């Protein structure tokens, strides 16, 4: 990208967020007339009508990312919350990248997995398919994602908001644009 003569080899540069586009435009001097932003879309599924949360019911949070993208921050927060009526369901695993990746990388997150098991207000669900995660989002109120990762877009946040969740995210990468 940094070699200007290569720009004529490409018809278009397509980005999934304006944040990502601006980063590449600035870093590589991309020709703006060859750039466009096409944001991610949601799967064509039937979204449930979510009943309004009622006082006295538990507040259910959901986290649906890989372990290295801020889960440690969220678990630290949950450790400080001393309430039985605030529950976090964590859908995280290295398995999403395949068995070989999981075998090579999952061990380093064992202390984090152990911490989840020790917190009574945290449920470590692990890996589930995207449709299973979307279904679970429809039974929670808050999508919690204190990301330490510069996301180019956050499809999980978009899915969670479509499921009627409030999104609590950091202002990092393109998260401000997604949420």
PLM-predicted stretches and their roles:
Residues 3, 9-35, 42-45:
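A short, active-site helix/loop in glycosyltransferases that binds the activated sugar's phosphate group
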Residues 68, 148-155, 176-177:
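Nucleotide-sugar-dependent
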Residues 171-179:
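Short acidic/histidine- and often glycine-rich active-site loop of Leloir-type glycosyltransferases
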Residues 138-152, 165:
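Acidic donor-binding loop of glycosyltransferase active sites
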Residues 53-69, 75-79, 89:
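Conserved donor-binding/catalytic core segment of Leloir-type glycosyltransferases
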Residues 151-154, 161, 171:
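Short glycine/acidic-rich beta->alpha loop that forms part of the nucleotide-sugar donor binding site
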